[in-house]
């Protein structure tokens, strides 16, 4: 990767000098000016940074001292660009803004020079570099925290594998250009790193170069045992063994895409490890708020809803502020006219950008007749608590992509709290983002069940999906076809960073079946048009291709 875009490889908080002074440098090999100075790694700060990269822009405030050059801090946010790369350009979301890169996302026209994908790419590599630095200087300080950092490095690499395919690979900080790893080999490395399998992986660009030899104990076995926590409990926000189990289940359900070989049995096995663990579905509503709504509210870390959270990204309007996490998910989808009632401060800073495409609303209204009503009225009309859309004074089908009212609005994420208390800051939400939650395991297990049984769920898979439907106060079904499983994933997980990967796995994004499922503005055409399977992954950023001659660009770019 091109390190010039990643600042603070050794952040100020990460190295404490014996004299009591801090050091901040972009150099990869840090040597004290005074040979007598002893450099002591600040293990807690480095450990925290490995997690914080998924929420914060940099070292200070919402945009302050961003770790990624070239874009403002909020735009480089991990969750913000996960949303853009997974939801924009699918049947789910479209954005009204004209910021460089947004129209390209909307119309599936991204290139190697796409600024936001470049920011996402370097945000992920920043996380990998922090993890590599921790494992270099703090390995052995705390075996459990070391295992967590190994897991986080796997997670960052997973998102790179999914979005960009064959990517640069390194497990250590180095000034030389990284070699390229094949997508299937990266899959195998992540699996081995988590489970402790013995493998040898060679560089894609030079097979004589050994990139990794994994034989150590897997990270999963050394991580914390699964425990459901609230924000009041010590360890809230840390990854436990169920995070590794769910990452493996997520990889296995997509294994045919990533490696060419299906792993349905493994997907079901690891998903059921999560289902049978302590991270249970949250099923208890509070007052006017449903159980499903409470997963995405300002007190989701305190209300009990976090029992479902396997990896919550912590947001706090007072001490942890960022434009690129739940602030973005809420503000970008809200307009002031969406308030449910005068006492509901759902969004303190509406930006009026992202909304839902008409094709997606057919998941809740199959006849294409979603009413022009408020959020609470919409859920009642759909007979499904998950239909959190605002249609009043909106157009059902998007005819004017740059106008926010052309298309229904999404009211899934909120600043308001289920107990009615005020947020810490009137604009900055306290809403945590559940990057991993146990509902995903139910969906993976059901899909694997159907794929193992001729495309129809057995009683086991049907039961998993009906538990989600029961939580949403909608009717149960006798069985589910694969397309119905896909629709159930859409209803449960929309706007949480999954849709492009799901459509790719089912063949409806790019490729031979792309024209079988069209949505408005797919491929840039108002009524939709199919496109090549080369669009199923994004281009490696031009900046990296230009400086690292080890890299080969993805086909079609």
What are these regions (language model features)?
Residues 24-78, 548-557:
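Membrane-proximal, proline-rich intrinsically disordered regions
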Residues 24-25, 43, 92, 124-125, ...:
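Long, intrinsically disordered, low-complexity segments
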Residues 44, 48, 52, 57-58, ...:
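Conserved, well-structured interaction surfaces
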Residues 99-109, 119, 359-437:
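Flexible, polar/acidic helix-loop-strand segments at domain edges
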Residues 159-168, 254-260, 453-454:
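Short coil/turn linking the two alpha-helices of tandem helical-hairpin repeats
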Residues 276, 281-405:
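Extended ligand-binding clefts on enzyme/binding-domain cores
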